[in-house]
Amino acid sequence: MDQKQALKFCTVCASNNNRSMESHRILQEAGYEVSSYGTGSAVRLPGLSFDKPNVYPFGTPYNDIYNDLLSQSAERYKANGLLQMLDRNRRLKKAPEKWQEGTKTFDFVFTCEERCFDAVCEDLMNRGGRLNKIVHVINIDIRDDNENAKIGGRAILELANMLNEKVSECEQNDTLFEDCILDILTKWQEAHPQLPCLYAPSYY
C-alpha cells in the first residue's frame, strides 16, 4: 500500500469552513487520506453586520449555507470571499462536521488554533483511550482569513510530507517513530517561525 494512503490525517478548526477545509483540500490533492472537523458549538460565519454573524448547526450542507448567503447579499459575500470558500467546501464534502461527534480514528490531527487543540485533547482524554491507539495532535496557529489559511495549508502539507517520510523510514529500519517526532517538529518550526506549533501525543 502507498504510504500516503496508509496514514490517516485530520484537520480541525472552529467551524470546519476556512482553515481546516483549505488544509483538507491541499492534503487531499497531494494524495493523503484526510477528514476535517470543527470544535465550536455551531458553525459561525461573518454576517452583514459585525454583531450579527450567520450561525448554522453542524451538519448543515455547505450548499445550503452558500444559497442562504447568496440570498442575503451575493455582492457582499463574494467580496469577502465567503461564497468562494463555500464553493470549495461543497466540492470536498457535504457539510461541516463536529469533532466531538466523530467516530473515525487518525494517525495525525492538525488543529489550527490553541482552543481547538485544547478541545481535541480534552475530548480524546474523555474518550478514555480504550483502543490504546496513539494519535499525534499538532497545533499550528493559523490566523482565520483566506490568505493565512492558504499559507497554513501549504505549511501543513510540508509537515505531513516530513512525517510521512519519517514513518516510512522508521518502518523500514524497524525503529520507533515516536522517538523522532519532536526532531521533525523542531525542524519544521525553524522553517515556519510565523506559525507557532504545539504537540501532544494522545490515545484513542
From Swiss-Prot:
Q: What is its EC number?
A: 3.1.3.16
Name of the top EC class for this enzyme: hydrolase
Superkingdom as given in the UniProt entry: Eukaryota
Q: Which UniProt keywords apply?
A: Hydrolase, mRNA processing, Nucleus, Protein phosphatase
* Cellular compartments annotated: Nucleus
The record's InterPro entries line, in alphabetical order, gives: RNA_pol_II_suA
What is the role of this chain? Component of the cleavage and polyadenylation factor (CPF) complex, which plays a key role in polyadenylation-dependent pre-mRNA 3'-end formation and cooperates with cleavage factors including the CFIA complex and NAB4/CFIB. SSU72 is required for 3'-end formation of snoRNAs.
Q: How does it assemble?
A: Component of the cleavage and polyadenylation factor (CPF) complex.
Q: Which family does it belong to?
A: Belongs to the SSU72 phosphatase family.
Which PANTHER family does the UniProt entry name for this protein?
A: RNA POLYMERASE II SUBUNIT A C-TERMINAL DOMAIN PHOSPHATASE
Return the protein name. RNA polymerase II subunit A C-terminal domain phosphatase SSU72
The gene that this protein is the product of is: SSU72
